[in-house]
Amino acid sequence: RTNGVILGINPEFTKYNFRMYPNEYHISGFAAYASIPKVYHIGLYGKFNNIIRSLPLTFSFFKTKLLLTNYYGYGNLTNYDKELDENEFYKTNQEVNKISLGFEKEITDKITITFNAEYRKLETNIYNTLIASDIPNNKYGLGNFKSLSGELGVTSDFRDSKTFPSTGTYFFLFYKVYPKFYENMNLYQKLKIDGRVYFNPEFLNKSILALRFGGEKNFGTYPFFDACYLGGKENLRAYVLERFSGDAYLFFQSDLRLPISNIKIIVNGKLGILAFAETGKVFTDIPDKKWHPSFGSGIWFSAIKNTFNIVYNIGFSNELITHYVQTKFGF
């Protein structure tokens, strides 16, 4: 199950100063509503270059019920029933309030280091006792929960375009630690990686082959909503969002994108087709050899020097046929 149609607004304000690059500060707000879970997501983000020279400070706040809308159980071997899903059998009711402060440091124009300190307040309920009984560590994380955390991220981006990459590489490494704090009774940690490569294969003129791998690992005893989740448009497109949860995950994706014609749809642009194949799995303390393949195809339109994209994907797995319409490529 997806979140359906998500409608929202994203106002932005930027103040420029010729002594500061690229600006003095930038503030953006957003508000969104998801049609299927019928929940909201609101937030505010700011980046300030005028407080500490050469060290931009960041601030964010959001309040949402959209982070975890369903819980399908722990591990690779859980059963899924589409009809039960449509009748809200797996539904969770979670509200998250989060505030963070941090900074960004550009080592070069291609490599950035970020640090954030974060406070969260959550309330999570699952009214289906059959689903709640599958939560590991004695349902750890249900009810009210507060946490503090510190995170460090390193991004290396050598792509030729952020919106329509055709060559180059992208790599992201992320570490986060949660110390003991109120309901968080255990120190736990999270490590995450995301690597991508783009090139133009000789066997198909003007095509783009995009390859991606991702992994995540938790260390220590963590609340169930901070498990490593796999499924949905971000990794396994032919499965519902956050279909599988575990102590770790690993996934691989491949996209072949082929332009087929120049076309005008209000503005001049390129029309193309794509095909994808991917697989992934989660890892728990009970070993298994189950992987979850997903494949599909789609059509895309790109315009305004590849900064405006509309992408349609249809995905197939042994559980579902999924459809996505987005304003960006999967990765």
Task: Label each region the model flagged.
Residues 27-33, 46, 57-75, 115-121, ...:
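Transmembrane beta-barrel strands of outer-membrane/channel proteins
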Residues 1-147, 151, 230, 243-245, ...:
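Gram-negative/organellar outer-membrane beta-barrel architecture
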Residues 10-12, 45-47, 102, 153-155, ...:
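Outer-membrane beta-barrel architecture
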Residues 15-17, 35, 50-52, 105-109, ...:
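Outer-membrane beta-barrel strand-turn architecture
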